[in-house]
Every structure is written in C-alpha cells, then in structure tokens.
C-alpha cells in the first residue's frame, strides 16, 4: 500500500500511522530521558548508577531482540518485495509515511543525542578510577533502531522484488 494518502488512515491502533510500535518507541525514549535526568545530578551515587545502567541495558536488550526479529521478518518479505537494510532500520525512501518517519526518526535522534550528552556529562568531574555509569546510555539507540525495524517489518511499504527470488533449494551443494 503506497503511503501517499494519509486520509485512508483511521484511529485504529493497528493501522500503520497509529501503530503501538510508535507508542512503545516514544515511551522507551521518555523512560530513558527521565532516568538520565535523574541520574545526571546524582551520577556519583550508587542508586543513580544502577538506574541509568539498568534502564540502558534493558532498552538495549529490547532493541537487540526487536532488531533480530525485524531482520527475520524482513527476510521473509524479501522473497517478494525489495527490502533494503536502510529502508528497514532507517525508514529511508517510501518505506514509511512522513508522520511515522518523523516520529521514529526524532525518537532515535533524541536517544543518540541524549546518550552522547549523558556520556560526556558523566566524564566531567570524574576522579581516577570512578565509574561513568552515564556512558551506558550509548546502548539505548539500539532500542530506536529495533523499533524502526519492527515498524518497517510490520507496516513498511516496499516495491516488488526486481530479480527472481532465490529459494534455498535452488542451489546445489558442491
């Protein structure tokens, strides 16, 4: 289905522009930002280190799982559709309608910027041998990449496959 006409979209949460994936991505980004905002002023305290480390590792784990799931789903779709990695994880080309691409790209950009700024703030004022727990935030953008992949695997619009789809049984073993 081409994404040129948004008038066909309804308020149903299963439609591409109202997908729950978008809500999960925005919520995960919000959780990370709140954890970072709490952890920055208390970066030397153990509770803040566990908070930012735990949230970052949880979002990273979710991102890894969703990235792998999206890749497996995209492999299935690639038998009949021209699916590219950039289309899948960065929503390039006609993969997603502009509102979806805007939200998911902004969420990923916010994750990247917040992670880098948090890691940089964590370095400031560290004594030798101290832990920069805020640096765990650099793991979080994997969550955004995974959410992009899930959305694109479920709802993405791809062109028809240009070449003949190759089945694993079409190859002979030498």
Which residues fall in each region the model found?
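Alpha-helical membrane-embedded segments
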Residues: 136-152
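Membrane-water interface of transmembrane alpha-helices
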Residues: 64-86
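Alpha-helical transmembrane segments
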Residues: 49-69
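Short membrane-interface loop/juxtamembrane segments of multi-pass integral membrane proteins
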Residues: 83-103
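Cytosolic-side membrane-entry/anchor segment at the start of a transmembrane helix
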Residues: 1-34, 150-174
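Short, hydrophobic transmembrane alpha-helix segments
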Residues: 40-50
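Alpha-helical transmembrane segments and their membrane-interface junctions
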Residues: 34-42, 105-137
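Select subsegments of transmembrane alpha-helices in polytopic membrane proteins
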Residues: 20-31, 98-111
């Amino acid at each position: 289905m081409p994404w040129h006409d948004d008038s066909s979209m309804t308020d149903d949460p299963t439609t591409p522009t109202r997908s729950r994936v978008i809500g999960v991505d925005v919520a995960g980004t919000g959780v990370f930002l709140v954890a970072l905002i709490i952890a920055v002023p208390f970066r030397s305290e153990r509770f803040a280190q566990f908070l930012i480390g735990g949230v970052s590792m949880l979002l990273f784990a979710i991102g890894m799982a969703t990235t792998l799931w999206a890749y497996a789903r995209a492999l299935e779709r690639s038998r009949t559709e021209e699916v590219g990695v950039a289309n899948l994880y960065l929503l390039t080309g006609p993969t997603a309608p502009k509102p979806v691409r805007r939200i998911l790209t902004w969420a990923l950009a916010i994750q990247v910027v917040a992670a880098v700024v948090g890691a940089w703030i964590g370095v400031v004022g560290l004594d030798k041998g101290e832990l920069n727990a805020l640096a765990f935030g650099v793991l979080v953008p994997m969550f955004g990449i995974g959410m992009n992949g899930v959305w694109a695997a479920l709802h993405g619009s791809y062109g028809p496959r240009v070449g003949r789809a190759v089945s694993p049984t079409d190859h002979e073993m030498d």
